[in-house]
A protein has these predicted regions:
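A short, polar beta-strand/turn micro-motif
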Residues: 71-86, 373-380, 385-390, 611-630
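Beta-sheet repeat architectures centered on beta-propellers
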Residues: 1-9, 413-734
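Conserved beta-strand element within WD40/beta-propeller blades
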Residues: 15-18, 65, 304-305, 358-361, ...
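N-terminal beta-propeller domains
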Residues: 1-32, 188-347, 410-426, 657-662, ...
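Long, charge-dense tracts
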Residues: 53-55, 62, 68, 82-91, ...
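Elongated alpha-helical scaffolds
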Residues: 51-72, 358-361, 367-368
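Short linear interaction motifs
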Residues: 37-54, 270-294, 340-349, 589-594, ...
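Beta-propeller and closely related beta-pinwheel folds
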Residues: 269-301, 307-454, 462-466, 470-498, ...
Length: 734
């Protein structure tokens, strides 16, 4: 399943799920919206691996859906060819001058004007009169032709087949002008033509790249496209659209210019515009034709496409136009089609806007596209930036001033942090997983993050029930002050399909044995539940009001979902001070119900699944300064850890397991119930801050120290200190 989140505005947010040949849309409250599929539209999303082969991007009410395996093509229907035709334009009339039209080698029209010996002969030299006389001859001498005169213009069309033609006059070619097939200059065109008549303007004789076509539209000569060409896209092979329609539902359709009706109002679907001017030389097909589209993105008010070794941008402001609007001149808003120049084959997989630039990813290299103030064919260039291998299963994600992308490390995976060094202005990509190379399992298929919450999530195909979490904190100069990797591990039967982030919430799509769920996780630190001074920590947490049965003296809570794991009931913030935040002793009555003795039906309670928190300390070492900014661990000698102190804040419960090598584990528990504390009330949760001290008495490499908690109460740790005895039998000589 391919998952995509649409964040239209604060009031409208939708989760899109694309299956093999099907598409569904839900609100974040779980309400399914109606999706109307245009005829044949779902053929585009027929694929056995939607997760890998589909990609989506949303702008306003339109979500572009691309199938990375679909080869784009042109429509096989060519435009209608014009019949063989010509226009004869009587440009000048002079006394005693002969005007001739020759067709297929035979003179079919001949007229000689009178001399100027008589003033009445002036009517003989008018251009309209000459055209009339020539037309009379044409009508007398030709059959199988359509002949129309309009003033000094004569239009001739052969009803079937082709013909050759030439003209003669006594004025050196300046009296009778022929327009057939092509003409040298736009200035040679008559003041008017025949509606639909088309001709090629050849321009310079040494090149075909300045040729263009014009036709008479009934009022003026306008630029047009050569007839008989395949100018349109095969819309069934182009990116499709998921449109949020005026009634609040959705329509999935190719961008084919079709129309649909809602109520009594008709709406038009956008259309990938075909070639409207020029020919295959002056206005060639975009380079994505005949290949697959790997990525689609927005940059500088253009819709960009990565295909093969090219990046193609639409006409500025026209996301469905990939042809020139005129071939007579170059315009700043023209489409742009540019290819790589590299000594390796560089198939472009992704385009990511980055610090006003565009970062382009191939399998082994990264390229920077940085135009001037405007993106035009004249100003654009692509330069190689770095060479890092990437895993193209997951699209890189930009967070703040960094871009994160995955790479393979044998049967494991890593994530690089791409940035511009503030010291050297060089582009670098540090390995965030260098100190734990075997932590993330292979094949990262999704990377999502939040710059506001300084967090990145990585999803792996090898561990579908895990969320790998990278947390980071940078100073004002983009220096990393803190970094960490951790993971959220769900039930072994859970399959995480994807996640997306809106503001401070991560929305997770999870497939379970009983269906697909959309669940959300609050990423904001120090959040508390209503009327509580902490957030109740339960998985799949929901607020439920219990039902009390006086006959059995039991309160029953019914979950909105089935659950077989151990669940808890915690009284919410609407309860009195002595009750709120308390966890009840409950009976797991069924997979959807919990019961507790007593009446707890007056206010809602939080119901959810218990989960385990675990943090294992790395080994403690003595460290010595190597440079002004770095330290190194000292492995020589013996370090005997005597004790440690854990500094915590706003914490209600945790346990610490200390396991010396070859000895049993000792557990030390903190419950928040501290005698003499002003917040201590028996049976009521209490959040405390302070230092928790515990003995170690073990060699640093022979002990494992783990913090854990399965409570609904929070635990927050600020730092840890240890002290011990370090002895060394050798001495370093310098």
């Amino acid at each position: 399943v391919k998952s995509h989140l649409i964040n239209r505005d604060e009031a409208e947010q939708y989760q899109v799920l694309i299956y093999n040949g099907n598409i569904k849309v839900y609100t974040l409250a779980g309400v399914e919206k109606t999706v109307v599929n245009a005829t044949g539209a779902t053929n585009y999303i027929t694929n056995a691996n939607p997760e890998k082969n589909f990609s989506c991007i949303t702008v306003a009410d339109y979500t572009f859906v691309i199938n990375k395996t679909k080869v784009t093509a042109k429509d096989t229907t060519a435009s209608a060819s014009r019949p063989d035709e010509a226009i004869y334009y009587v440009k000048n009339g002079q006394y005693r001058t002969t005007y001739k039209i020759i067709i297929d080698g035979t003179e079919v029209a001949n007229f000689q004007t009178l001399d100027n010996s008589n003033a009445s002969n002036a009517s003989s030299i008018t251009t309209d009169n000459i055209a009339t006389e020539l037309t009379n001859d044409l009508n007398s001498n030709l059959s199988g032709y359509t002949i129309v005169r309009d003033g000094s213009i004569i239009y001739v069309k052969k009803d079937s087949g082709t013909f050759t033609s030439s003209v003669e006059d006594g004025l050196g070619g300046d009296g009778l002008i022929q327009l057939k097939d092509k003409i040298g200059s736009f200035s040679d065109l008559p003041y008017k033509g025949y509606t639909g008549f088309q001709i090629e303007i050849t321009g310079d004789k040494g090149t075909e790249f300045d040729n263009y076509f014009v036709r008479w539209d009934g009022n003026a000569w306008v630029e047009t496209v050569k007839d008989g060409l395949k100018n349109d896209f095969d819309k069934s092979t182009m990116p499709h659209l998921l449109i949020r329609t005026a009634d609040g539902n959705f329509r999935f359709t190719p961008a084919d210019g079709s129309s649909y009706t809602i109520g009594s109002t008709s709406y038009d679907v956008p259309n990938f515009k075909g070639r409207t001017v020029g020919d295959e030389t002056t206005n060639p097909d975009p380079s994505f034709i005949g290949t697959t589209i790997n990525d689609i993105f927005f940059y500088r008010n253009r819709l960009g496409i990565c295909a093969d070794e090219n990046v193609i941008f639409s006409k500025a402001g026209e996301f469905f136009n990939y042809y020139f609007s005129t071939v007579t001149t170059t315009q700043d808003d023209d489409m742009v089609d540019i290819s790589m120049s590299h000594n390796k084959v560089s198939i472009l997989k992704f385009g990511i806007p980055f610090n006003e630039e565009l970062l382009l990813f191939s399998d082994q290299s990264q390229f920077i596209l940085k135009p001037e103030e405007t993106l035009t064919a004249k100003t654009v260039s692509i330069n190689q930036a770095t060479e890092y291998e990437i895993d193209d299963s997951a699209k890189p994600v930009g967070l703040g001033q960094n871009i994160y992308f995955g790479f393979k490390r044998g049967t494991f995976a890593g994530v690089r942090e791409y940035f511009i060094s503030s010291d050297s202005e060089m582009k670098e990509a540090t390995d965030t997983t260098i100190n734990l190379p075997r932590y993330i399992t292979s094949d990262i298929f999704s990377l999502k993050g939040s710059a506001a919450e300084n967090v990145l999530f990585a999803l792996s195909n090898a561990d579908r029930n895990k969320l790998f979490v990278y947390k980071f904190y940078f100073d004002a100069n983009q220096k990393a002050l803190q970094r960490s990797w951790s993971s959220f591990i769900f039930e072994s039967t859970d399959v995480i399909l994807d996640l997306d982030i809106i503001q401070n919430f991560a929305y997770i799509v999870i497939k379970r044995s009983d269906g697909v769920y959309l669940e959300k996780m609050n990423l904001k630190a120090n959040e508390v539940d209503t009327n509580l001074d902490f957030s109740v920590l339960l998985d799949r947490k929901t607020s439920v009001t219990g039902v009390y049965n006086s006959g059995t003296n039991l309160t029953t809570w019914t979950l909105p979902y089935p659950e077989t794991a151990t669940r808890s009931v915690v009284l919410g913030g609407n309860w009195s001070t002595n009750f709120r935040g308390r966890s009840l002793q409950v009976n797991q009555a069924s997979n959807t119900t919990l019961t507790a003795t007593g009446d707890y039906s007056s206010n809602p309670a939080f119901v959810g699944r218990n989960f385990n928190f675990k943090y294992e300390f790395s080994k403690f070492y003595v460290r010595e300064a190597k440079t002004a900014t770095s330290k190194a661990s000292v492995n020589l000698g013996r370090l005997q850890i005597k004790k440690m102190a854990l500094v915590f804040g706003d914490t209600g419960f945790f346990e610490i397991d200390i396991t010396p090598l070859a000895r049993t584990t000792g557990t030390h528990k903190f419950t928040g119930q501290i005698l003499g504390s002003s917040g201590f009330i028996l049976g009521v949760p209490n959040m405390e801050s302070g230092t928790f001290k515990l003995p170690i008495q073990c060699k640093n490499t022979d002990v494992t120290i783990v913090i854990k908690s399965d409570s609904h109460l929070p635990c927050n740790f600020l730092s840890a200190e240890w002290n011990g005895i370090y002895s060394i039998l050798s001495q370093r000589l310098t």
